[in-house]
From Swiss-Prot:
<comment type="similarity">
    <text>Belongs to the TorD/DmsD family. TorD subfamily.</text>
</comment>
<dbReference type="InterPro" id="IPR020945">
    <property type="entry name" value="DMSO/NO3_reduct_chaperone"/>
</dbReference>
<dbReference type="Pfam" id="PF02613">
    <property type="entry name" value="Nitrate_red_del"/>
</dbReference>
<dbReference type="InterPro" id="IPR023069">
    <property type="entry name" value="Chaperone_TorD"/>
</dbReference>
<dbReference type="GO" id="GO:0005737">
    <property type="term" value="C:cytoplasm"/>
</dbReference>
<dbReference type="InterPro" id="IPR036386">
    <property type="entry name" value="HscB_C_sf"/>
</dbReference>
<dbReference type="InterPro" id="IPR036411">
    <property type="entry name" value="TorD-like_sf"/>
</dbReference>
<keyword id="KW-0143">Chaperone</keyword>
<dbReference type="GO" id="GO:0006457">
    <property type="term" value="P:protein folding"/>
</dbReference>
<dbReference type="GO" id="GO:0051259">
    <property type="term" value="P:protein complex oligomerization"/>
</dbReference>
<protein>
    <recommendedName>
        <fullName>Chaperone protein TorD</fullName>
    </recommendedName>
</protein>
<comment type="function">
    <text>Involved in the biogenesis of TorA. Acts on TorA before the insertion of the molybdenum cofactor and, as a result, probably favors a conformation of the apoenzyme that is competent for acquiring the cofactor.</text>
</comment>
<keyword id="KW-0963">Cytoplasm</keyword>
<dbReference type="InterPro" id="IPR050289">
    <property type="entry name" value="TorD/DmsD_chaperones"/>
</dbReference>
Length: 199
């Protein structure tokens, strides 16, 4: 059953904002401390209720393992770079253009441009990211929910704009060898959450 039938708009917004905050850039010290201090326990419980208990358990285990490092945040920052910032053979670049062929990418970005214009979202403002970066897609999806666009429109966006390439990205992320499995788990969880959101 789609999340739109199980969760309130506020809950779905929280979920997608959470994913965006973890994948937009390296975690800050306050973000990591909040995760390790159990401030997201109720959110993790919600994810478990939705069928993601294995991923939640894995994530909690990874957070516990981080305490063994002298500088957990720097360890995660290195993993973020390893997973997402190196060249294509070494990282799982979070860009649609890396996974779609020219025709599909052109169609995908044409739709993205329409939504970016409609919502007046600015690109290259803070992180110098092109419009095919995963977090730009999440920003548009968040706007679709915030502005109460019809559920069918939201699901079409997920299906056509994201799920045409995100499974390949998540699979590539899973193959990256990093110190922790934090980002591999987050990527898998995001994919599963999106797939369930249109079920």
């Amino acid at each position: 059953m789609a999340h739109s039938q199980l969760l309130s708009s506020e809950e779905r917004l929280f979920c997608y904002r959470w994913f965006h905050s973890l994948l937009a850039k390296e975690l800050s010290e306050p973000q990591l401390q909040a995760l390790q201090a159990g401030q997201f326990a109720s959110f993790f419980a919600l994810l478990a209720e939705l069928g993601f208990q294995p991923q939640v358990t894995d994530l909690q285990n990874e957070l516990a393992k981080l305490t063994a490092y002298d500088s957990p945040r720097l360890e995660l920052a290195a993993d973020f770079a390893q997973c997402f910032l190196l060249e294509g053979k070494l990282s799982a670049l979070p860009y649609a253009s890396y996974y779609l062929d020219e025709r599909d990418l052109s169609e995908n970005l044409a739709v993205m441009d329409q939504w970016l214009t409609k919502f007046q979202l600015k690109i290259n403002r803070l992180h110098n990211e092109p419009s095919d970066h995963l977090c730009i897609y999440l920003e548009v999806l968040i706007k679709l929910i915030e502005t109460e666009q019809p559920v069918q429109v939201q699901q079409q966006f997920i299906r056509q704009q994201l799920l045409g390439w995100l499974p390949q990205w998540a699979e590539k992320t899973a193959q990256i060898h990093s110190s922790t499995a934090f980002y591999q788990i987050i990527s898998n969880l995001l994919l599963g959450f999106l797939q369930q959101d249109i079920a």
